A protein has these predicted regions:
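Short, solvent-exposed loop/turn segments at the edges of secondary structure
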Residues: 256-257, 436-438
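A short acidic, glycine-rich active-site loop
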Residues: 268, 321-323, 374-385, 431
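Short beta-strand segments
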Residues: 290-292, 349-355, 382-385, 407-412, ...
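Metal-dependent active-site segment of extracytoplasmic phospho-/sulfohydrolases and closely related
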Residues: 212, 387-426, 467-468
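Membrane-interface soluble catalytic domains
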Residues: 2-25, 37-43, 58-65, 131-133, ...
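A long, amphipathic alpha-helix that forms part
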Residues: 50, 54-55, 193-197, 334-341, ...
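Transmembrane and membrane-interface helices of multi-pass
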Residues: 2-171
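Active-site-proximal alpha/beta segments of enzymes that process anionic O-linked groups
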Residues: 162-214, 218-369, 460, 464-496, ...
C-alpha cells in the first residue's frame, strides 16, 4: 500500500512539474507544426525531436525570438500549401516565384475553407506558449535532462544516417534544395537564351502550310470523352476527323518543368532552351507567332516566356505584374483570326491557354458550369474541358475558312491528381501518379478524312520529333529522338529526378 502511495505521489509531482507540463505543451505544438509543414504520417521520433528543439530554444530569449517565433509564423503561412501539396518542392518554389497577383488570389480562393483552420491553429500556439510557457522561462539547470536526451537522439540519428529523414530537418533542407534547384534551372535557361540554335536542315522545307499549336493546361486525358470518359466533356473532338494519341505522356508534372522539356531539346534533367520549337520552325522558313493567356512576369523571366521571346511576333494578354487581370482564353481567338486574315501560308502560331488551370470555376469566364455534381470543383473542372473543346473547334474553323493547308496540334502540359482534404476530393498538382503525366495529344489537319487512334506509346520529350515529322522538316543535326517510345522505357521528370512512368501509382477518374 505504501509502495502504491509513493508511486502515486511521484506521478502527481511529475505531472504537476512545470518542466513536464512545458514539455507536454510542446508535444502538442509539434503535432500541429508537423501537419503545417505538409507531412501526413508522424513518427514518435519526429514529435520528440521537434518538441525538444522548441523547448530548448525557447529557454533562451534570443533563440526564442529569432528562431522559434519566426519558425512558427512561417509554418502558419505555409500551412495551406502544406496541407494540399506537402513539404517544399521545386514545384512549390517555382509557383511561388512565378505566380502573378491574379493567380495568387485565385489560389487563395481555391483553398478549401477547412485548410485555413490549420494556420489559425498554428498561430494560436504562439499565444498559448506565450501565456503558459514563456512567461516563466525554465532555469537552465532544469533543461539539462532534455539537453542530454536531445544530444543522444541527435547522435543516434547521425550514426544511423537518418538525420535528413527527420521532418524538421527535411522541411528546411527541402526548402533550400528546391530553391537552389529552381535557381539552377533558371540560370540554365537564361544561359540558353544567349546561345545560338544548332538546327541544320536537310534542304528547304517544302511543306507550305499553316501550323497551330494549342498548349493546354492541367487537362487529364482520362476525363475526356474523346478517350472514353462517360460524360461528354469533349463533344467536338469526339466527332472531328484527325489523329488522336491515347498513350502520350508529359515530361513533368507542372508547367515550369514540363513545357521547357517539351518545347525544347532535353535529356530529362537539363534542356537546351535555344533549340526549341520556335527556332526549329524559323530554321524551316516559317514565320512564328506566340499568343499567350498565361502570365508574363517581370522582364520575360519564366521558362516558357523565354521560349516565346524567340518568336517573330508575340503577344501576352496578361503581363504578370500588378496589372494582371483574369483574361479569358477566348480573347486569343481574335488575335489568331487577324493573323490568319493578313498572312498566307508558312506560319506557326502557338496559342498558350489557361485551360483547366485552377481556380477551375474562374476559367469559365462567368459562364455557369455545364455539368452539375455534389462536387462543385469537379463540375467546374470538367466544364473547362468543354470550354477548351470549343476553343479548339473555333480555331479549327478559322483555319478551314482560309482554304489553305493546315495542321492544328493540341496537348496539355501536365495532368492533376486527386487529393482527399477533409473528406472531400480535390484536383491538385502532384508527381506520384501516372495521371499527373497522362495528357491528351491530337493533330487535326485539312486533309483528314477519318479518325485515327494512335495507341503506340509516345512521350512529350519527343514532341519536337513529332512536329518536325508532321511539318515535313528533315534535320541533319542535332539528331532528334524517335517519336515513338518503346513501352516500359518511358521516364518522366518528377521535379527531382527521372523516374519510371510505368511504376507510378494509379489514380482513376471520378464519375459525375
Amino acid at each position: 500500500m505504501k509502495t502504491h502511495t509513493a508511486i502515486s505521489n511521484k506521478t502527481h509531482i511529475l505531472a504537476t512539474s512545470p518542466v513536464v507540463r512545458n514539455f507536454l505543451l510542446f508535444v502538442v505544438v509539434s503535432l500541429i507544426l508537423i501537419k503545417a509543414m505538409g507531412y501526413g504520417g508522424t513518427k514518435g521520433v519526429d514529435i520528440l525531436f521537434i518538441s525538444l528543439s522548441l523547448l530548448l530554444l525557447s529557454a533562451i530569449p534570443l533563440t526564442r525570438y529569432f528562431l522559434v517565433i519566426p519558425y512558427i509564423i512561417f509554418c502558419a503561412i505555409y500551412a495551406p500549401v502544406g496541407v494540399i501539396y506537402g513539404p517544399p518542392s521545386v514545384s512549390v518554389v517555382s509557383a511561388l516565384f512565378q505566380t502573378n497577383r491574379a493567380e495568387a488570389i485565385e489560389f487563395l480562393y481555391a483553398i478549401p475553407a477547412g485548410c485555413y483552420l490549420l494556420p489559425c491553429a498554428t498561430l494560436l500556439t504562439l499565444f498559448i506558449l506565450a501565456r503558459y510557457s514563456w512567461q516563466q522561462p525554465l532555469p537552465v539547470r532544469k533543461t539539462l535532462p532534455f539537453w542530454v536526451i536531445f544530444i543522444v537522439l541527435l547522435f543516434a540519428r547521425i550514426l544511423s544516417g537518418g538525420v535528413g529523414n527527420l521532418h524538421l530537418v527535411d522541411f528546411f533542407s527541402s526548402l533550400i534544395s528546391s530553391y537552389q534547384s529552381y535557381n539552377q534551372q533558371m540560370a540554365e535557361i537564361e544561359a540558353g537564351t544567349h546561345s545560338q540554335p544548332s538546327w541544320l536542315l536537310n534542304g528547304a522545307n517544302s511543306n507550305k502550310a499553316n501550323y497551330v499549336i494549342v498548349v493546354g493546361e492541367s487537362m487529364r486525358r482520362d476525363y475526356m470523352s474523346l478517350f472514353g470518359y462517360p460524360t461528354p466533356t469533349t463533344p467536338f473532338l469526339d466527332h472531328v476527323n484527325g489523329t488522336f494519341y491515347s498513350n502520350y505522356i508529359s515530361t513533368a508534372p507542372n508547367t515550369f518543368e514540363s513545357l521547357p522539356r517539351t518545347l525544347a531539346l532535353s535529356d530529362g534533367k537539363t534542356h537546351h532552351i535555344a533549340d526549341n520549337i520556335i527556332t526549329l520552325a524559323k530554321a524551316a522558313g516559317l514565320h512564328t507567332y506566340w499568343f499567350s493567356n498565361q502570365g508574363l512576369i517581370g522582364q520575360f523571366d519564366t521558362p516558357i516566356s523565354k521560349i516565346a521571346m524567340f518568336s517573330d511576333e508575340h503577344q501576352f494578354l496578361k503581363k504578370g505584374d500588378y496589372q494582371s487581370r483574369n483574361t479569358d482564353d477566348d480573347e486569343l481567338l481574335p488575335l489568331l483570326q487577324t493573323a490568319l486574315a493578313h498572312n498566307g501560308v508558312g506560319n506557326l502560331y502557338v496559342l498558350h491557354i489557361m485551360g483547366s488551370h485552377s481556380d477551375f470555376c474562374e476559367r469559365l469566364g462567368g459562364e455557369p458550369p455545364v455539368f452539375t455534381s455534389d462536387n462543385a470543383e469537379l463540375a467546374c473542372y470538367l466544364s473547362t474541358y468543354r470550354k477548351t473543346d470549343r476553343f479548339i473547334e473555333h480555331a479549327y474553323q478559322m483555319l478551314q475558312a482560309t482554304h489553305s493547308p493546315f495542321k492544328l496540334f493540341y496537348f496539355s502540359d501536365h495532368g492533376l491528381s486527386h487529393r482527399d482534404i477533409d473528406g472531400k476530393l480535390y484536383l491538385r498538382h502532384g508527381g506520384n501518379n501516372r495521371q499527373n503525366y497522362e495528357v491528351p495529344l491530337l493533330v487535326l489537319s485539312d486533309s483528314d478524312r477519318q479518325r485515327t487512334l494512335i495507341e503506340n506509346p509516345h512521350s512529350a520529350f519527343d514532341f519536337l520529333s513529332l512536329f518536325a515529322q508532321q511539318a515535313g522538316i528533315t534535320l541533319t543535326q542535332p539528331q532528334l529522338p524517335a517519336a515513338v517510345t518503346a513501352q516500359g522505357k518511358r521516364h518522366v521528370f518528377n521535379g527531382q529526378e527521372m523516374v519510371d512512368f510505368d511504376q507510378l501509382a494509379n489514380d482513376p477518374p471520378e464519375l459525375l
